[in-house]
Each structure stands twice: as C-alpha cells, then as structure tokens.
Design a protein with these regions (language model features):
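Dynamic "connector" segments at or just before major functional cores
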Residues: 1-168
C-alpha cells in the first residue's frame, strides 16, 4: 500500500514532464532540495548572489552559468556537504540537477568540484563586500514591516594557523 502524503506546495513541471515524488525509487536521498528549489524560485537569493559576482571567465569556455554554480554550491551545503570534496559525485545526482534547473535524467552534469572551488576563491575583498551587501539587500526585501527581526551574528575570532588561504 502506498502512502500518498500531499505536499505543501505544487511541484513544477520539469523538462515538460509532471514531477512526482516517490519514496521507493532509491535514486537520491536529497528530497529536501525540492523545497530549496521552490524557495529559491520565490526569493531569488542565489540569483541575486550570482548577479553580484563578476564573471571573469573566458566567454568561449563557459559551460555553467554563474547562477547554476552558486545554486549547486548552496544545494550541496544544504544537504550537509560543507566542503567541496563531494561535488564531483553530487554533480550527477538527479535532485541536485533538478535544484539547479537541469533535467534530472538527461541534463548535463553540474559544475565540477574544481570549477566550484575556483568560484569560491575568486572574489576579491571588494567583491566579497558586494556579496554581503546583496545578502543584506535580500534580507531587507523579505522583512515585513512591523515585525521584530533578530540577526544573530557570531563574531567569535577563530585563529587560523599556518599558511591557510585568506587567513588573517
């Protein structure tokens, strides 16, 4: 007997096909990415970050849009993959591809670990400040007037030892 629990949102069509959820397929364990995808469609946080990042890549060699790279990285972090070493495996995951906007079965693989790592290390200090400003702007557009919002920012100093990149 199948248990059909209604979802709290409608699933969009994917590659002109109706999307259904089945917990017996054993294709991916990243079902929460459907929620993340819908939130991104509603809020556009990853799109805003991608637009704030300068793209210094050679236009003739670009295979992945900046938004796709940012969204793939955010999706990986949301699934518990904080560092980038799992991204070469995740780039073929059907739900990761779906979260980024690619066809799960037939769409091209997502950006590789090295591509995403280059993106993470590319911003200069002024560009990092622009990314922070984009997040603050995003926060400002989502706050409802008259509500109390608390930003809990951890300012704990964490010393980095050795010659670590971007260490103080």
């Amino acid at each position: 007997m199948l248990d059909h629990t209604p979802l709290p949102f409608d699933l969009p069509s994917v590659c002109r096909k109706k999307l259904t959820v089945d917990f017996n397929g054993n294709q991916s364990s990243h079902g929460g990415l459907l929620l993340l995808r819908e939130k991104e469609r509603a809020l556009g946080v990853c799109r805003r970050l991608a637009e704030a990042m300068p793209d210094r890549r050679d236009a003739d060699r670009i295979r992945h849009a900046m938004f796709e790279i940012v969204m793939a990285r955010v999706a990986a972090i949301a699934c518990g993959y904080e560092d980038a070493n799992d991204l070469d495996r995740l780039r073929h995951d059907p739900l990761m591809k779906l979260a980024v906007g690619r066809c799960p079965q037939s769409g091209a693989a997502l950006a590789s670990q090295s591509t995403i790592s280059r993106l993470e290390n590319a911003p200069r200090k002024t560009e990092a400040a622009r990314l922070c400003a984009a997040l603050i702007d995003q926060f400002g557009t989502t706050v409802r007037p008259g509500t109390l919002e608390i930003l809990d920012i951890d300012d704990t100093f964490c010393a980095a030892h050795g010659a670590q990149q971007l260490a103080f």
